[in-house]
């Protein structure tokens, strides 16, 4: 999702640049030899590493080994290939999942490794922490500008709308739409609906990141990127209900995991560099719903 948004924004904002895309169809980025060969052939000035194995709570709970191992392989492969090719600049797309389960809110960048991680996200988070620290070490040891973006949860066009792997907003839109079409009286929500999450529209993030490539030396080692406010799970489902036009209600399965109670970022450091997301939740979810309908 973010990768496709970056490609679209690059064409708009930097049309004169020579952009090389490496998708999973081109190279298995878990394969260190294949990744090394691809980077050596292209010899880029900058790399945006947005590849990751991602999913919702259900998927991470069912396959923790996959989320840890695949992301460790991806990140070590890409970053080591960049180091070997002496690529001067790399932007690593991390995750707010790297922050502790129970700690002060909002999170600041120095809160990394300050307390235990959320158990459901632990495997994925450990891999993303390793990727972030690898960038930090490479920058310190070799003098490269390898920096880490730590976005809040993201939503936007081209998301994964599957109920097994989709993130909250995409899954909510898919479930509410299905209930609307079927005439179901209620939609089931995991947990009690009170857990709070911060979501940023992927196009806003992509546009700003594209503007930053070539200037990552001005960044600290890692930087939070969020909208600065959060909503409860129920509030996101209510927004999906408004966007879809669904008139039914909600049921709650409190036996299912809902993740940590709150995760919100302090993006003050990014604001000093010009970060200022503009898309409201209602506008963003309306665009996502249109994208969902066009994909059906």
What is each model feature region?
Residues 3-4:
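N-terminal Rossmann-fold NAD(P) dinucleotide-binding loop
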Residues 9, 178-296:
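C-terminal substrate-binding subdomain of Rossmann-fold SDR/epimerase-dehydratase oxidoreductases
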Residues 11-37:
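Adenosine-cofactor binding site in Rossmann-like domains, unifying the SAM/SAH pocket
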Residues 32-72, 84:
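NAD(P)H-binding glycine-rich loop region in Rossmannoid oxidoreductase-like domains
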Residues 72-78, 127-135, 169:
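Conserved catalytic Lys-bearing alpha helix of Rossmann-like short-chain dehydrogenase/reductases
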Residues 76-121, 147:
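Conserved Rossmann-fold NAD(P)-dependent oxidoreductase catalytic core, especially the SDR/UDP-sugar
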Residues 102-111, 136-213, 237-244:
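NAD(P)-dependent short-chain dehydrogenase/reductase
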Residues 113, 123, 127-130:
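Active-site helix of classical SDR
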């Amino acid at each position: 999702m973010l990768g496709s948004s970056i490609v679209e924004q690059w064409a708009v904002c930097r049309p004169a640049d020579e952009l090389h895309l490496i998708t999973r169809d081109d190279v298995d980025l878990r394969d260190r030899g294949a990744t090394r060969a691809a980077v050596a052939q292209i010899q880029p000035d900058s790399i945006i590493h947005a590849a990751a194995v991602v999913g919702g709570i259900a998927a991470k709970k069912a396959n923790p080994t996959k989320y840890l191992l695949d992301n460790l392989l991806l990140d070590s492969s890409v970053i080591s290939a960049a180091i070997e090719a002496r690529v001067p600049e790399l932007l690593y797309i991390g995750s707010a999942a790297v922050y502790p389960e129970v700690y002060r809110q909002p999170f600041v960048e120095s809160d990394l490794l300050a307390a235990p991680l959320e158990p459901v996200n632990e495997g994925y988070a450990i891999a993303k922490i390793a990727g972030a620290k690898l960038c930090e070490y490479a920058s310190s040891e070799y003098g490269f500008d390898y920096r880490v973006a730590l976005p809040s949860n993201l939503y936007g066009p081209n998301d994964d709308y599957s109920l097994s792997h989709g993130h909250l907003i995409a899954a909510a839109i898919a479930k509410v739409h299905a209930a609307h079409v079927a005439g179901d009286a209620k939609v089931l929500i995991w947990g009690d609906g009170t857990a709070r999450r911060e979501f940023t529209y992927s196009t806003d993030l992509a546009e700003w990141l594209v503007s930053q490539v070539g200037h990552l030396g001005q960044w600290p080692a890692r930087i939070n990127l969020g909208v600065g406010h959060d909503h409860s799970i129920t509030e996101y489902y209510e927004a999906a209900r408004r966007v879809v036009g669904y008139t039914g209600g909600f049921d709650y399965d409190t036996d299912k995991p809902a993740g940590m109670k709150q995760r919100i970022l302090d993006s003050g450091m990014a604001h000093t560099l010009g970060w200022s997301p503009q898309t409201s939740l209602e506008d963003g979810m309306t665009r996502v719903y249109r994208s969902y309908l066009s994909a059906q």
